[in-house]
UniProtKB/Swiss-Prot annotation:
GO CC list: cytosol
Protein name stated in the entry: Pyrimidine/purine nucleoside phosphorylase
Pfam families: Ppnp (PF06865)
Entry keyword set: Glycosyltransferase, Transferase
Family of this protein: Belongs to the nucleoside phosphorylase PpnP family.
Protein task: Catalyzes the phosphorolysis of diverse nucleosides, yielding D-ribose 1-phosphate and the respective free bases. Can use uridine, adenosine, guanosine, cytidine, thymidine, inosine and xanthosine as substrates. Also catalyzes the reverse reactions.
EC class: transferase
Keyword check for Iron: no
Record GO terms (molecular function): guanosine phosphorylase activity; purine-nucleoside phosphorylase activity; thymidine phosphorylase activity; uridine phosphorylase activity
Catalytic function, reaction form: a purine D-ribonucleoside + phosphate = a purine nucleobase + alpha-D-ribose 1-phosphate; adenosine + phosphate = alpha-D-ribose 1-phosphate + adenine; cytidine + phosphate = cytosine + alpha-D-ribose 1-phosphate; guanosine + phosphate = alpha-D-ribose 1-phosphate + guanine
Superkingdom: Bacteria
Gene responsible for this protein: ppnP
Length: 104
């Protein structure tokens, strides 16, 4: 996992979801790809996906339950998890979660 992204454009307007519990900014790359960099404050939320995603966790800890699953899996800073396209996942955070969402 890289510690910085070079030669990118950042959308100034924040993406604010769930009454401010999740805040991110979109990062645009020269090759046309995009990522979001953000934080999720302590909460339990459900996210829907359009594109497949890799959620890279920089700091914090969370529990994830993918659509159709019954079990929760725990992830923390330095780990990542993948979510299929046109799906959803539940996320529970106790501490603030710092993440990068890679759209794949």
């Amino acid at each position: 996992m890289t510690t910085q992204f070079d030669n990118v454009s950042v959308v100034k307007k924040a993406n604010i979801y769930f009454d401010g519990k999740c805040v991110s900014h979109t990062v645009l790359f020269a090759d046309g790809t995009k990522k979001t960099i953000g934080i999720i404050f302590p909460s339990t939320l459900k996210f829907n996906t359009g594109a497949a995603e890799i959620m890279e966790l920089n700091a914090g800890k969370c529990r994830i339950r993918l659509a159709g699953a019954t079990e929760w899996n725990t992830y923390e800073g330095g780990q990542q998890f993948e979510v299929p396209a046109n799906s959803s996942f539940d996320i529970e955070t106790v501490d603030t979660l710092d993440y990068v969402c890679h759209f794949i």
